[in-house]
Structure formats: C-alpha cells, structure tokens
C-alpha cells in the first residue's frame, strides 16, 4: 500500500503505538485503545504537517486498531488533519468486539497473543517470543479447550502486562471502570 500512495505523490507514514516495536512506552500494552493515543496522533499529525516535504494536509487511513486510533486523533481536532478513512473500527470495544453478547470473544485470545509478538516486554527475548508463538498461537485451540485459565499458567505469562490484559478481558464480564478506560467509548 505505501508504494501505491508514493507513486501518486503522497508520503506514507506509519507510527508505532506506544509499547510496541521500538516506540516509546513503559511496556503497558492496551490491546484496543488507551488514553494517550489521541494525543499521540495529534502530535504526529502536526509534526508531519511541519515537515518540508508536506503540503500541510494530512489524512489518515486504516482498519481495526488503526481505525480506532485515527478516530481518537480526529476527536482532538488537529488543524492539519484533512480527512480520515476508518474501516472496521468499533466505537466501544466491550460491546462490539471483546465481549459482544457478554462472553469473551475467543478471537481476542489469539489477537492478544499476536500482539505479544511485537510487545516491548519480550521483543528481545527469543525464548519468550517462541513460547508465545508456539504455545499461545500454534496451540490456541488446545489452550481454549483448557478453560478456565489462571494467571501464570498460560504461555503469555512471559509478558506480564499482556497477560494482565488477557485476564482483564477474560474475567471482567461487566462493563466497569477498567473497560471504560480500555474502550475510550465513542458510542453516541
């Protein structure tokens, strides 16, 4: 996709989320949303607009989490943001993705494991990455059949912050203060 845009005169910029890949962060990982993504998006948009290679017009696009973060950035109203194109981004993670209908959506189990592969807390530990990849992803069906889970007993235990997120998703059946901060609820 970046090539398509570059061939048409656009600059394509990708920003890593906090605590993923080599971005800043304290290792705390929010699978869905967090309180600072809108602020980070605002700062990035305004930084891009100030670059000599930019005409001052910035647009955002993406699906899933990229849809969520562009909505969060747009809510801050950065002056150089001209357009957003969010695709498949839920406005309330609790209601429309993680616990639709009340029970934990099983796809969230593997999604959190997928995101662990780029989490700062294990990125430099090959054994931990392999434990997550082999145990949590390759054997996901077997793990899901072992429910109920307990902290410290799942392959994600090598990434404590993500394990905490997994168990918050797993145990928190009612919408509460944790879900409110995790969702950054945008439901009208």
Language-model features: locations:
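Cap/lid segment of the alpha/beta-hydrolase catalytic domain
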Residues: 1-49, 105
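Tryptophan-centric aromatic hotspots in well-structured domains and transmembrane helices
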Residues: 42-47, 51-53, 71-72, 97-98, ...
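The substrate-binding groove and active-site-proximal loops of carbohydrate-active enzymes
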Residues: 26-35, 58, 112-121
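Catalytic nucleophile serine of serine hydrolases
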Residues: 23, 64-65, 88
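Alpha/beta-hydrolase fold nucleophile elbow
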Residues: 52-65
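Short glycine-enriched nucleophile-adjacent loop
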Residues: 65-78
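Accessory cap/linker subdomain of secreted extracellular hydrolases
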Residues: 1-2, 7, 75-188
């Amino acid at each position: 996709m970046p090539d398509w845009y570059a061939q048409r005169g656009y600059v394509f910029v990708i920003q890593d989320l906090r605590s993923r890949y080599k971005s800043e962060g304290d290792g705390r990982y929010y699978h869905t949303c967090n309180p600072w993504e809108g602020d980070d998006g605002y700062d990035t948009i305004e930084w891009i607009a100030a670059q000599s290679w930019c005409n001052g017009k910035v647009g955002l696009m993406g699906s899933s989490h990229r849809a969520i973060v562009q909505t969060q950035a747009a809510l801050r109203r950065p002056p150089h943001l001209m357009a957003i194109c969010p695709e498949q981004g839920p406005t309330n993670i609790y209601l429309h993705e993680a616990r639709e209908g009340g029970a934990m959506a099983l796809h969230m189990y593997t999604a959190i494991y997928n995101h662990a592969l780029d989490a700062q807390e294990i990125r430099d530990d090959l054994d931990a990455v392999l434990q997550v990849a082999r145990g949590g992803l390759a054997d996901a069906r077997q793990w899901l059949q072992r429910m109920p889970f307990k902290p410290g007993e799942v392959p994600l235990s090598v990434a404590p912050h993500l394990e905490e997120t997994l168990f918050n998703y797993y145990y928190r059946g009612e919408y509460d203060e944790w879900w409110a901060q995790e969702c950054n609820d945008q439901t009208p």
